[in-house]
Curated annotation (Swiss-Prot):
SUPFAM superfamilies: ApaG-like (SSF110069). Signal peptide: none annotated. Transmembrane segments: none annotated. GO terms for biological process: error-free translesion synthesis. Residues 2-126 form the ApaG domain. InterPro entries: ApaG_domain, ApaG_sf, Uncharacterised_ApaG. This is Protein ApaG.
């Protein structure tokens, strides 16, 4: 695979889902909204995802699969694609990170890295 520079910028917003969580059973639910921005001059297509979810105990859950939320979106130049998904952890704080396997308009594959971001129950660090 050739080295193709990624024109992708990724923004993440997270939310603790208190109503769906069961603290007594150590089930903490979080949603995350991802915005994938194509800063390049050509369209790109998201082909697959790879997540590493790490809780406060250091337990890791790895998730791989095609697309995101059932889609393999094509993102036009200077536009964005946004989706919301969720995860459950056994601790009130943790981290997610990963990557998207992308394809450019020439059919060349490249990786868009998702930097680590924190999932935390509000007030946990006060």
């Amino acid at each position: 695979m050739s080295q193709v520079e990624s024109p992708i910028k990724i923004k993440v917003d997270t939310q603790y889902l208190e109503q769906q969580s069961d603290v007594a059973d150590n089930k903490y639910l979080f949603s995350y909204t991802i915005t994938i921005i194509n800063l390049g001059d050509n369209k790109v297509t998201l082909k697959d995802r790879h997540w590493i979810i790490t809780d406060a105990d250091g337990e890791q859950n790895e998730v791989k699969g095609p697309g995101v939320v059932g889609e393999t979106p094509t993102i036009a130049p200077n536009t964005a694609y946004q989706y919301t998904s969720g995860t459950v952890m056994e601790t009130p704080v943790g981290f997610m990170q990963g990557s998207y396997g992308m394809e450019n308009h020439k059919g060349e594959r490249f990786v868009a890295t998702i930097p680590p971001f924190r999932l935390a129950v509000p007030g946990i660090f006060q």
